[in-house]
UniProtKB/Swiss-Prot annotation:
Modification comment: Two-component system major event consists of a His-to-Asp phosphorelay between a sensor histidine kinase (HK) and a response regulator (RR). In plants, the His-to-Asp phosphorelay involves an additional intermediate named Histidine-containing phosphotransfer protein (HPt). This multistep phosphorelay consists of a His-Asp-His-Asp sequential transfer of a phosphate group between first a His and an Asp of the HK protein, followed by the transfer to a conserved His of the HPt protein and finally the transfer to an Asp in the receiver domain of the RR protein.
Phenotype of the disrupted gene, per the record: Dwarf, narrow leaf, low tillering and altered kernal color phenotypes.
Name used for this protein in its record: Two-component response regulator ORR5
GO cellular component terms listed in the entry, alphabetical order: cytosol; nucleus
Source species: Oryza sativa subsp. japonica (Rice)
InterPro entries: ARR-like, CheY-like_superfamily, Sig_transdc_resp-reg_receiver
Record bears the keyword Cell division: no
Residue numbers bearing the 4-aspartylphosphate modification: D66
Domain Response regulatory span(s) in chain numbering: 16-133
Amino acid sequence: MATCRSRGVERGGAPHVLAVDDSSVDRAVISGILRSSQFRVTAVDSGKRALELLGSEPNVSMIITDYWMPEMTGYELLKKVKESSRLKEIPVVIMSSENVSTRINRCLEEGAEDFLLKPVQPSDVSRLCSRVLR
């Protein structure tokens, strides 16, 4: 089984991060930060699309997802990933513009790797990726 550090990394390539956010602006920001740090990025606009992509391409190094999204929240996406024997090793990071300790704790208890507050800063992503993926 691939580890979180090797999962989604092609030989000699960069880690593959799945960015999930219903806001096109936030999706572009997080994708830009990740790409500037030399990560391969696939960006989708919903938890449902993330699960569809993971069904056809499970080789993702990490998932960074917004908490509040229509159809499926980031928390619901986290639960589905962690319940899947095929996907549960993928680190999931939740992002939110709301600093609500009960929500943060619930996500961490459910298996989230970390919780980032928006607006996400390049230093936050750099710290996170170096800890989780390198």
